[in-house]
Amino acid sequence: MLKHWRNRAAALGLSLCLVGALCPVAQAVGPEVSAQSAVVLTADTGAVLFEKDGHTPQPVASTTKIMTALLALEAAQEQGDPLVDITQEMVAVEGSSMGLQAGDSISLTGLAAGMLLASGNDAANAAALYLDGSLESFAARMNQRAAALGMEDTHFVTPSGLDGEDAQGLGHLSTAYDMALLARAALEDQAFRQLCSSPSLAVEFAEPVKRVTYTNHNKLLAQYQGCVGVKTGFTKEAGRCLVSAAERDGALLIAVTLNAPNDWQDHTALLDYGFSQVEPYQLAGGDVRLTVPVVGSPVEVVSLRGSNGGEVTLPLGQGAQVERVVHAPKFLYAPVESGEQVGEICWYLEGQLLGSAPLTAAGAAPLQEKAPSLWERLFG
């Protein structure tokens, strides 16, 4: 039905722009937090609601496992969730553990659960070594994904988040803002979201055959209404680190604190503040009605109709700054099918795409039948 609508149009000359007056948005006083760095943003649009030193690179401890678990889950989905045979090299790591032993056999998804609930460094190492053969190669995979997500001030060295340096002397560092970007991407993966939002989870081992129940270290799952994750972390150098997410009235917010002595209290204050600073905004396009001429059809014009693009979460007062752009062709070539997408409606805020919806043909325009030739008229 789509038929590459952009290629069918002679020109997208009817780009209609509808935008409200640009109004300054009053900024409320943000919360006092113990964290050295903190960020709160909306998950759907990425709008920053609060920031404290959010772009300074520093150690992020086990919140690193958000990346490791996401990569493991993606590989599990691609490879049919293979079993990982645990080796001594995989479990030779200090710190928190899911209790793996050499000779165990467990799925990649089971390892991801061990990372996100028990914060297992052994699980992180096992996934890294299984997927890429060495911790260095897996770190390259992590950094490649970080770059793709726009994590400009991040450099990963270890899959677990333990402090370390690579061969070039670069440390394992990220920022509160970058970790929020990572959480935003990870929460779009339903398997990841299910794991990190589970207060506890039973994980099956294939060898030896057993079931082990792990309890999530994230106290906010029980303490904060609507909390859906994400990951705790601590090392002596990083201090207490926490990435959280909570959902309320359709709005999903992400909060990050790094080096926060009172991280639980910080996140309660940050999320409460964030929810007080947002409102839903409907990407309305159902009112769009246009007509365009059709070439090569007995139907001379076709009506086009827009559709709504759903609902997004915006900072208070910024709905007036949303720009709606209607991309419609100057004309169409027959045949045109009813319901066929022939254009697009896009919504932007400060140049960032908030969403899009199809512009479709409200009626059909069949191809003009070829006139019979003289021979066909005489002898047909």
How would you label these PLM feature ranges?
Residues A26-Q190:
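Active-site-adjacent loops and short helices of periplasmic peptidoglycan-processing enzymes
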Residues L2-G13:
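Bacterial N-terminal signal peptides that target proteins for export
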Residues L16-Q27:
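C-terminal segment of classical bacterial N-terminal signal peptides
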Residues N7-A9, I66, R248:
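Hydrophobic alpha-helical segments, especially transmembrane helices
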Residues Q168-G380:
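Domain-terminus/edge residues, biased toward the C-terminal soluble/receptor-binding domains
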